[in-house]
């Protein structure tokens, strides 16, 4: 396990091994079959396909935050399934090309993403709220109130 963080979104990134840094991959444009679950997603930018989501638990709720720069709220779906699963998905289309345009570089991400989270028993599934501001999706799942055990003092006789 490397103690160095990966900045390449799941790709090999051992800074001490020059062959592990995917700087130039001569085979990346060949259409090899891929049996991975993400094979149905476009391969333009793995950073978008593997959208990162933060999940924190506060005393009142479970809060999920996803950075989705450039997406409109209409391009994102937040769903809750009966078996306590929160699903966040969306898609950004590739920009349409004009025959007169000459592209020098294409680095902006495009493609589909899908993230699923199994929620704990204390989640109020019927009270989930979502908002999107400045490209950050925030999903708030309130928690059931935990009833405090009622403590009754017993007088000791004798």
Swiss-Prot record:
Q: Which InterPro entries match?
A: A-crystallin/Hsp20_dom (IPR002068), HSP20-like_chaperone (IPR008978), Small_HSP (IPR031107)
One of the protein's GO biological processes: protein stabilization
Biological source species: Pisum sativum (Garden pea)
Spell out the subunit comment: Forms oligomeric structures.
Example GO CC term: the record gives: protein-containing complex
Q: Does the keyword Cytoplasm apply?
A: yes
Q: Name one GO molecular function term.
A: identical protein binding
Q: Coding gene?
A: HSP18.1
In which family does this protein belong, per the annotation? Answer: Belongs to the small heat shock protein (HSP20) family.
- Chain segments annotated as transmembrane: none
Pfam families given in the database record = HSP20
Protein name listed in UniProt: 18.1 kDa class I heat shock protein
Q: Which CDD domains match?
A: ACD_ScHsp26_like
Q: What is its main location?
A: cytoplasm
Q: Where is the sHSP domain?
A: 44-158
Keywords in alphabetical order:
Cytoplasm, Stress response
In which compartments does the protein localize? Cytoplasm
Q: Which PROSITE patterns match?
A: SHSP
């Amino acid at each position: 396990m490397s103690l160095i963080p990966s900045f390449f979104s799941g790709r090999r990134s051992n800074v001490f091994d020059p062959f592990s840094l995917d700087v130039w991959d001569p085979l990346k444009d060949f259409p090899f079959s891929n049996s991975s679950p993400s094979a149905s997603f476009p391969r333009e930018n793995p950073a978008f396909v593997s959208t990162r989501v933060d999940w924190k638990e506060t005393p009142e709720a479970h809060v999920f935050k996803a950075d989705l720069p450039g997406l409109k709220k209409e391009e994102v779906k937040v769903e809750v399934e009966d078996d306590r699963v929160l699903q966040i998905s969306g898609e950004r289309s590739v920009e349409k090309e004009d025959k007169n345009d000459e592209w020098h570089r294409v680095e902006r991400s495009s493609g589909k993403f899908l993230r699923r989270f199994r929620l704990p028993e204390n989640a109020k599934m019927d009270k989930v709220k979502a908002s999107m501001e400045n490209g950050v999706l925030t999903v708030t799942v309130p928690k059931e109130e935990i009833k405090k055990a009622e403590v009754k003092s017993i007088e000791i006789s004798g």
